[in-house]
């Protein structure tokens, strides 16, 4: 299979960017509904991260700040990927986290090159990932 039209094709995976703003769980459900095996994106290398940041940045022209959900969430004080993949790479500032902010976003103010944690009920744009 090829990637759906308008999605990024990068090293055997497809990435779809959606600007509808949804809470994290609804964004994950949306990804799953689009294609079998799709989830909010997991990011495992700096190359993958840069490719995603560049892809999302094409849609941004200095408009209002719009952080983007990825598939990273905090469960029992451990960060994990919703697709079950192992966490090999992080762009989170691992210092200390305000309570109640258990889901991760690509931070728009960094050009999507750093991650931040946000309240999972906040509404953000999101990026889905599936295998090509």
Swiss-Prot record:
InterPro entries: C-type_lectin-like (IPR001304), C-type_lectin-like/link_sf (IPR016186), C-type_lectin/snaclec_domain (IPR050111), C-type_lectin_CS (IPR018378), CTDL_fold (IPR016187). Gene3D superfamilies: Mannose-Binding Protein A, subunit A. It comes from the Eukaryota. Residues 10-129 form the C-type lectin domain. Disulfide bonds join 3-14, 31-128, 103-120. It is found in: Secreted, Extracellular space, Extracellular matrix. Its main location: secreted. GO terms for cellular component: extracellular region. Keywords: Disulfide bond, Extracellular matrix, Lectin, Secreted. One of its GO terms (molecular function) is carbohydrate binding. Signal peptide: none annotated. PANTHER family: MANNOSE, PHOSPHOLIPASE, LECTIN RECEPTOR RELATED. This is Struthiocalcin-1. It comes from Struthio camelus (Common ostrich). The lineage of its organism: Eukaryota, Metazoa, Chordata, Craniata, Vertebrata.
């Amino acid at each position: 299979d090829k990637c759906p039209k308008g999605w990024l094709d990068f090293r055997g995976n497809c990435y779809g960017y959606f600007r509808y703003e949804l809470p994290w769980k609804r964004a994950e459900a949306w990804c799953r509904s689009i294609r079998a095996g799709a989830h909010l994106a997991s990011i495992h290398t700096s190359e993958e991260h840069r490719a995603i940041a560049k892809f999302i940045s094409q849609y941004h022209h200095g408009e209002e700040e719009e952080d983007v959900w990825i598939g990273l969430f905090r469960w029992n004080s451990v960060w994990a990927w919703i697709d079950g993949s192992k966490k090999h790479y992080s762009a989170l500032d691992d210092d200390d986290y305000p309570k109640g902010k258990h889901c991760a976003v690509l931070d728009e103010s960094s050009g999507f090159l750093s991650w931040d944690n946000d309240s999972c009920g906040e509404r953000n744009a999101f990026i889905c990932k599936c295998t090509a």
